[in-house]
Amino acid sequence: MILTIKIWRLSLAKFLNMRRFVGLLLILLVGFAVYRFYIKPKYKSESGPKMAPIALKEHTERFNGSVDKMMAAYLDIKNAFVEEDTGRAKQSTQIFIALLDSVPLQELKKDTASIFETAQSNLNDIKANAASLLSQSDINEMRKDFSMVTEMLYPSFFKTINYEGPQLYLQNCPMAFGDDQPANWISNNIQVVNPYLGKQHPKYKATMLHCGSVKDSIRGK
């Protein structure tokens, strides 16, 4: 009987000691958590905030000037289609093709050969579609070639050369060649003036002249 009581007291003492140990452990854990999340100061990088990369001018004035002149001719083609003037559209296209050849792509070789080759391929595709426009007699077919020239210019050519000229806008007509055939064009004005439906459309007349939307902003540096 006495032995049983001693064993029971010993077990109770161990139990109480265990409870004190667990209680102390909990206090330590809670204290650490308070310090970790509420008291300890946050680490601050000595290098400071990360800076955005600075855009540097990469092309010469000659290169950018030639691209600007090329785009001025493109915009003349667009404006001719707004007026339904096929003669002016072809004349402006001839100027546009000549100005394509004046872009000094050799300057791009200072970057990498692949950039030069891609830009050269882009210009060849643009020139082929512009030449096709000259061979057309139907204004609708001419406009289709104009839309292909646009697709080759942006994003293809402009992205390749890292365009640095004045701000332009990529605009879209959802029904350029029918209710479900959209087409894009580039403008130097955010206001939509549609070269595919124009001022003298056989069905809509001038009522759809401002039909369309701005899809993208083409920002130079």
For each predicted feature, which ranges?
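Intrinsically disordered, low-complexity terminal tails/loops enriched in metal-binding residues
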Residues: 2-221
